Amino acid sequence: MATKFPKFSQALAQDPATRRIWYGIATAHDLESHDGMTEENLYQKIFASHFGHLAIIFLWTSGNLFHVAWQGNFQQWVLNPLKVKPIAHAIWDPHFGQSAIKAFTRGGVSYPVNIATSGVYHWWYTVGMRTNEDLYFGALGLLVLSTTLLFAGWLHLQPKFRPGIAWFKNNESRLNHHLSGLFGVSSLAWSGHLIHVAIPESRGQHIRWNNFTSTLPHPEGLTPFFTGNWGLYAENPDTAQHIFGTSEGAGTAILTFLGGFHPQTQSMWLTDIAHHHLAIAVVFIFAGHMYRTNWGIGHSMKEILDAHVPPKGRLGAGHRGLFETITDSLHMQLGLALASLGVATSLVAQHMYALPSYAFMAKDYVTQAALYTHHQYIAGFLMVGAFAHGAIFFVRDYDPEVNKDNVLARMLQHKEAIISHLSWVSLFLGFHTLGLYIHNDVCVAFGTPEKQILFEPVFAQFIQAASGKALYGFDVLLSSSTSAASVASSKIWLPGWMEAINSGKNSLFLTIGPGDFLVHHAIALGLHTTTLILVKGALDARGSKLMPDKKDFGYSFPCDGPGRGGTCDISAWDAFYLAMFWMLNTISWVTFYWHWKHLTVWGGNAAAFNESSTYIMGWLRDYLWLNSSPLINGYNAFGMNAQAVWAWMFLFGHLIWATGFMFLISWRGYWQELIETLVWAHERTPIANLVKWRDKPVALSIVQARLVGLAHFTVGFIFTFAPFVIASTTGKFA
């Protein structure tokens, strides 16, 4: 007899209704709820899955390299990075007519292709790759690594090679290895690659395995390192006239602190980047030897945390209990990891355009826009996930005795103050920002645009001036040539930095005005409201005045019946659900702002943003509507063009998004009645009633239907905005 799905839960497998399938899918990854799951087995399964995850990532990157080498135009692109469009892969589609084949045949090849907007060409070029053979070698290497990781994942599930629970909870050893190995040694290896391969390649010197050991990356070799004369490595850097990829204007320095950008590529100096990674390596390798393991020397994490008790008693027991709490809670660990990675991903989005590290990418506007949008959306998902697992921690793992009067307990005790302050900030930001926008709309609508309320963002301008931007005339710190900050760094990195920050050729500290001030506060509203919902969801996850026993109902529950009718929508899951909508809206405001600002800056018409961004109709008309032209006209009665695929995606993105509302607005009873009516009709329809099913059809629960609605809303949201960003930018600058 075949075992019914799901195998991990006998109770669900024996459920006679279709909820068996839906609850099975819903709890497939809730490993700790599975039958017979022990703590040790849980850790082992998660550990093994990490290898599978890494294998998938490396297989995917191997596929990128392979398809570009096979179907792309990397070697042609290398010869002219500013003019040749980089190809991701070829397209074969039976729907393509002659006009489509013609429209999608570009990039100097004779077959239809997709253009790459991920920046991989710029990355591979910058790190020293030049030929398709290089790409094939990379693809093969990653394929081998992927296979090795898959084997390692399988191996660590075998009884002999399963680590024990003590190994997983050995925090100091894990921290040492991750700091030294993961961050330190990998940074050292990367700086080594830059020094030995990428920097010589940028100077026209081809280094591969055949001459790797016989070619010195610096004329003095290791002598300056062993004699302590490290400054030699910074002498004779590339000149401002250096032609990237050639020896013309090239220097010999390998570790510099020039600041600013390479004039031709508009990317950071490779020698600065190598220096950065070497410094990171030293710091992290040192940090990875600080924690106590085998020899009883170094820091004990528990001792450090237990000692963190402020003397005046304002934080009670301080960090006591946190070591045990974090060690024993995977949800707490995951929450902290997701929050850290979320912040890092958002920072990547900000830095990739402001301080581009890849040659010529600053001039590939479509790639710049795609990468910014991509990283900000991912950051949003990671941050919401962090709070979701924080809430699950409070429901499942939080022990009041272990955490008695420590910072966690005091967060729970002060939750009313925390939540009400966040609420006040959100209300203040919302009413004032919207009030200003609407006032300005009224003024423009009634023919008195000069009466708009326009605030100059003086504090932000002051910060820009402190970093060296001279335009505002503040004459402070780095924008003052006589300040201590300027004098201290004037001989090192400051000349390059000052040239960059005051140049109109990059996105470093863009000039800001009233439109930026308003949208900044609109984004602040979104961030604070999302945070309010998530923080409230986590802090109220164990219980509230309305429902003190909430933790007994678990992370997600629809309602606690008619007896306590006010208990709908108050589970921690509901907070996550609501926060997702706010997160998506906030990230869209962030990306709208970034994209519109850059479209006008790149087009040499910054005034268009400055004039139209101070009122809401300006955003709707001059950003969204005006830039949707390539999407609306990708295909029409007269034919199609290369934007047709984005136009089509823009359309079906809207449709998926709209489908979400069907599940979000109609609730369970409607679906149950509909299903029962359909079953009645099916059973009375000749021929159709020959088909029977074992499970009794039952509508999705409220929580599940909301998840289906949210999934459609989210996927549709992204499939609408992604093609908008790519097609509208391509339409202007391709």
Curated annotation (Swiss-Prot):
Stretches that traverse the bilayer: 46-69, 135-158, 175-199, 273-291, 330-353, 369-395, 417-439, 517-535, 575-596, 643-665, 707-727
Subcellular localization, as worded in the UniProt entry: Plastid, Chloroplast thylakoid membrane
Membrane-topology annotation of the record: Multi-pass membrane protein
InterPro entries with a match to the protein in the record: PSI_PsaA/B, PSI_PsaA/B_CS, PSI_PsaA/B_sf, PSI_PsaB
Residues noted as binding chlorophyll a B3 in the record, renumbered to the chain: M662, Y670
Binding site for [4Fe-4S] cluster: C559, C568
Binding site for phylloquinone: W671
Cofactor-binding details, from the entry: P700 is a chlorophyll a/chlorophyll a' dimer, A0 is one or more chlorophyll a, A1 is one or both phylloquinones and FX is a shared 4Fe-4S iron-sulfur center.
Assembly and interaction partners: The PsaA/B heterodimer binds the P700 chlorophyll special pair and subsequent electron acceptors. PSI consists of a core antenna complex that captures photons, and an electron transfer chain that converts photonic excitation into a charge separation. The eukaryotic PSI reaction center is composed of at least 11 subunits.
Protein's UniProt name: Photosystem I P700 chlorophyll a apoprotein A2
